[in-house]
UniProtKB/Swiss-Prot annotation:
Residues 8-227 form the Radical SAM core domain. Belongs to the radical SAM superfamily. MoaA family. Gene3D superfamilies: Aldolase class I. The gene is moaA. Pathway: Cofactor biosynthesis; molybdopterin biosynthesis. Signal peptide: none annotated. This is GTP 3',8-cyclase. S-adenosyl-L-methionine binds at residues 30, 75, 126, 197. [4Fe-4S] cluster 2 binds at residues 261, 264, 278. GO terms for biological process: Mo-molybdopterin cofactor biosynthetic process. GTP binds at residues 17, 71, 102, 163, 266-268. It holds the Pfam family Mob_synth_C. Catalyzes the cyclization of GTP to (8S)-3',8-cyclo-7,8-dihydroguanosine 5'-triphosphate. The keyword Isomerase does not apply.
């Protein structure tokens, strides 16, 4: 029996984001800049991470509260050993209709088949440039874009449904929009361009670095004939368009210029086992890991999750101004703990 619960703003709970690790093999400036996350950076020890059994238990309880979709994030989730074991466990939960994973793609050839065999069917690959030199400068690990493109080709060849996510920063990679759109249009792969967000504390964000949806659309319409597409479901974060000549869709995610707080249905669990109701959360999250390890029953866990959702009133992107951004500096949870 699924309970229907809503938060203070009337938003139901439909999605669960599970961060399985705080580690990543890239050092992108907007997420894990190398100056902060150097070779001597201390990541979470294994006992500080939720176990797969704990994650599956959490997901099962959330499914009883209305969660239908789960997304596995990180850090880089493919760095978590035996991730296919978690995928298999999540696939056995009644009520979960969709399991996705967000990855930088570097380890897809190594782990893609085992994840597919465990039941994973859908992945989002983060790729912020198609130019090799530029992409190397973005990831700060000397990884070429062509390497990731080969991993994407492999993923599609084994049956994974791939979408590509691109975070656009003004003056950094906004010149990649057209060539990337052209490349993935020909590949019949959906690409989504994301406005640069002020997630975490270390990415040097300010409004001047944002390329808005309208600015992107103006650029795109100078090169392609497109039509808008109606939203597929409540809470869809991207504004979708379709190429007139071959029908391939692409999306623009307006995380800054046109917020979607009013339809946000996502609960988030960080890699250290804490609940957050918002990607931009500033207060320390509720420690689900400690709560579970104290010996609570599933019913007690459900009541706690209900209470956390019912007091949720987060709407940071609705309220974002230069002042709120300044006030929240050094207070937000970093992206490698909570995922995207």
């Amino acid at each position: 029996m699924v309970e229907q619960i809503k938060d203070k703003l009337g938003r139901p709970i439909r999605d669960l984001r599970l961060s399985v690790t705080d580690r990543c093999n890239f050092r992108c400036d907007y997420c894990m800049p190398k100056e902060v996350f150097g070779d001597d950076f201390v990541f979470l020890p294994k006992n500080e991470l939720l176990t797969f059994d704990e994650m599956a238990r959490i997901a099962k309880v959330y499914a009883e509260l209305g969660v239908k979709k789960i997304r596995i994030t990180g850090g880089e989730p493919l760095m978590r050993r035996d991730l296919d074991v978690l995928i298999a466990k999540l696939n056995q939960i009644d009520g979960i209709e969709d399991i996705g994973l967000t990855t930088n793609g570097l380890l897809l050839k190594k782990h893609g088949q085992e994840l597919y065999d465990a039941g994973l069917r859908r992945i989002n690959v983060s790729l912020d440039a198609i130019d090799d030199t530029l992409f190397q400068s973005i990831n700060n690990r000397n990884i070429k874009a062509t390497t990731i493109l080969e991993q994407i080709d492999y993923a599609t060849s084994i049956g994974l449904n791939v979408k590509v996510n691109v975070v656009i920063q003004k003056g950094i990679n906004d010149d990649q929009i057209i060539p990337m759109l052209e490349y993935f249009k020909d590949k019949h792969i959906e690409i989504r361009f994301i406005e640069f967000m002020d997630v975490g504390n270390d990415n040097g964000w300010d409004f001047s670095k944002v390329v808005t949806k309208d600015e992107m659309l103006t650029m795109i319409e100078q090169h392609f004939e497109i039509d808008p597409v109606e939203p597929k479901y409540f809470g869809e974060v991207a504004k979708y368009y379709r190429h007139k000549d071959n029908g391939v869709q692409f999306g623009l995610i307006t995380s800054v210029s046109q917020s979607f707080c009013s339809t946000c249905t996502r609960a988030r669990l960080s890699s250290d086992g804490k609940f957050y109701g918002c990607l931009f959360a500033t207060v320390d999250g509720f420690n689900v890991k400690a709560f579970i390890r104290s010996g609570v029953t599933d019913e007690e866990l459900k009541e706690q999750f209900k209470a956390l959702w019912q007091i949720r009133d987060d709407r940071y992107s609705d309220e974002r101004t230069a002042q709120t951004v300044a006030n929240r500096q050094r207070k937000k949870i970093n992206m490698n703990y909570i995922g995207g």
